[in-house]
Design a protein with these regions (language model features):
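Conserved beta-strand segments of alpha/beta enzyme cores
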Residues: 26, 47-49, 85, 120, ...
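Rossmann-like NAD(P)-binding element
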Residues: 45-47, 51-96
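NAD(P)+-binding Rossmann beta1-loop-alpha1 motif at the extreme N-terminus of oxidoreductases
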Residues: 1-39, 43
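Hydrophobic Val/Ile/Leu positions in short beta-strands of Rossmann-like dinucleotide-binding domains
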Residues: 5-6, 64, 147
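Active-site-lining helix/loop region of Rossmann-like oxidoreductase modules
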Residues: 144-207
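Rossmann-fold NAD(P)-binding glycine/threonine-rich loop
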Residues: 90-137
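Residues that mark the start of a beta-strand
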Residues: 2-3, 85, 144
């Protein structure tokens, strides 16, 4: 059985872990607050384990499911990510929550790749709201999962992971496309307030 190591114990971590457990993956939560991690693991059941950041990583894939503002504090303490597939599920929202912290033409995912050059970074899960991930569908339809990556093996691994966990994976191309995916996620967040959808809407490509 493959294992997924998820960094974080918040709503996004819960969503990805829920889908992973349902698909038969082993799940390891890597956390700074061990009590919070254990509480989530208890709710998820199915042998979900909890480790602290800096401890052994058991997952074949590592997922960053923490606020973007915490990434720089967490990446180095995580330890060696050499050769690992690292999913960036973050959105680089600025401290004032008025927009993206990145400059035009750059992305949080590429900044993470620079912080962890030995890892193979894949952008994924940042455009799907956590509640929808827990539900695993929207109006009876699979959720669209947009991904971007440079490393082909990592791309293939995340496509397989996404499909096995019930998503319809849409490959957008190179990691540089993360800038577009992060802008799309920010727009989707803003629409929650103008449309009153309470973070329950989903982005979908209608073929």
């Amino acid at each position: 059985m493959s294992t997924i190591s998820i960094v974080g114990a918040g709503n996004v971590a819960r969503g990805i872990a829920t889908r992973s457990v349902a698909a038969g993956y082993g799940v390891q939560l890597l956390v700074r607050d061990e009590a919070k991690g254990k509480a989530l693991a208890s709710q998820l059941g199915n042998g979900v384990t909890v480790g602290t950041i800096g401890g052994p990583i058991t997952g074949d894939i590592v997922v960053l499911a923490i606020p973007y503002s915490a990434v720089s504090e967490v990446i180095r303490p995580l330890g060696s990510l050499s050769g690992r597939t690292l999913i960036d599920a973050t959105n680089p929202i600025n401290a004032e929550s008025t927009g993206l912290a990145t400059t035009p033409g750059t992305s949080g995912a590429e900044a993470i790749a620079a912080l962890a050059p030995e890892a193979h970074v894949v952008k994924a899960f940042n455009t799907v709201f956590a509640g929808n991930m827990v539900a695993g569908q929207k109006n009876g339809q699979p959720l669209d999962l947009f991904i971007a990556a440079d490393d082909e093996a990592a791309r293939t691994a995340v496509i397989a992971f996404g499909e096995k966990t019930g998503f319809r994976v849409i490959d957008t191309g190179a990691l540089s496309q993360s800038a577009t995916l992060e802008a799309l996620a920010w727009l989707h967040m803003q629409l929650q307030f103008t449309r009153g959808t309470n973070f329950a809407s989903a982005i979908a490509i209608i073929d």
